[in-house]
């Protein structure tokens, strides 16, 4: 096994960042060779399971839910609200298992009726936020599957989000499994969600790669107990 795979963290798994995994978007978009090389390296290095962040496979944007009703500046009243008790705060709670009803009630306790109504409209038009799968990552996932590598998805999402994503993203029905934060009542980058995911699916940590969209999860793992975590380029 190559040296970079021996420099594993205390949990035994390797994380990579998408900027390293696919350093040039145009390379992947216009040439199959670049993505094939990534897949080939995964196979050569004995990786049996690749876990994509859910949001890499699903084309989602919350702002689309209000676009057909209001100009952007109206939507920003909701989406850019203050961090404490605002939109992002309550969406994080939903991703950790809160229901829509609980989120709306809590939001209404901290904001006026106009903004709360926008939040309610966001839920009513929730499915409009999805545009299908992200082609470049879905293509890589299919290449991995074709080569015999098991592919999974794990990310921060509510049950409603996952349900809608499944109806618009064929790749989610082709991979080995989809897990989301609401099931664990934990959100990335909490290290326990990775441990629980590996245990739940019976995966071997030393042969699993997590493909992340940013470095927050990696940095959190290092800060807690994973100082020897290796970030590398496939």
Where are these regions (language model features)?
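Short, well-structured secondary-structure segments
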Residues: 150-155, 230
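A metal-dependent, Asp-based hydrolase signature
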Residues: 88-123
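Hydrophobic alpha-helical core bundles mediating ligand binding, dimerization, or RNAP-core interactions
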Residues: 66-70, 82-85, 104-108, 122-127, ...
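Active-site neighborhood of HAD-like aspartate-dependent phosphohydrolases
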Residues: 11-18, 38-86
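Short, acidic loop-to-helix structural element flanking the phosphoryl-transfer center
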Residues: 120-152, 191
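Alpha-helical elements of Rossmann-like donor-binding domains used by nucleotide-donor carbohydrate transfer enzymes
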Residues: 64-69, 88-89, 102, 106, ...
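Asp-based, Mg2+/Mn2+-dependent phosphohydrolase catalytic module
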Residues: 2-29, 34-53, 138, 158-159, ...
């Amino acid at each position: 096994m190559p040296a970079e795979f021996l420099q594993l963290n205390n949990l035994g798994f390797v994380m990579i960042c998408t900027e390293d995994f696919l350093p040039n978007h145009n390379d992947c978009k216009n040439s199959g060779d670049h993505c094939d090389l990534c897949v080939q390296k995964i196979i050569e290095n004995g990786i049996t399971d690749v876990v994509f962040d859910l949001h890499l496979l699903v084309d989602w944007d919350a702002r689309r839910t209000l676009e057909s009703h209001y100009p952007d500046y109206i939507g920003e009243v909701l989406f850019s609200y203050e961090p404490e008790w605002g939109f992002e705060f309550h969406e994080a709670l939903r991703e950790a298992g809160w229901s829509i009803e609980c989120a709306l009630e809590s939001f209404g306790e901290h904001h006026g009726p106009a903004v709360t109504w926008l939040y309610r409209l966001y839920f009513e038009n929730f499915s409009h936020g999805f545009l299908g799968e992200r082609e470049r990552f879905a293509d890589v996932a299919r290449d991995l599957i074709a080569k015999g590598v098991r592919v999974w998805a794990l990310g921060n999402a509510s049950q409603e989000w996952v349900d809608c994503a499944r109806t618009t993203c064929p790749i989610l029905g082709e991979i080995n499994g989809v897990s989301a934060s609401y099931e664990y009542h934990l959100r990335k980058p909490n290290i326990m969600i990775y441990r629980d995911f590996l245990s739940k699916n019976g995966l071997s940590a030393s042969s699993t790669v997590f493909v992340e969209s940013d470095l927050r999860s990696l940095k959190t793992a290092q800060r807690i107990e994973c100082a020897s975590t290796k970030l590398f380029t496939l």
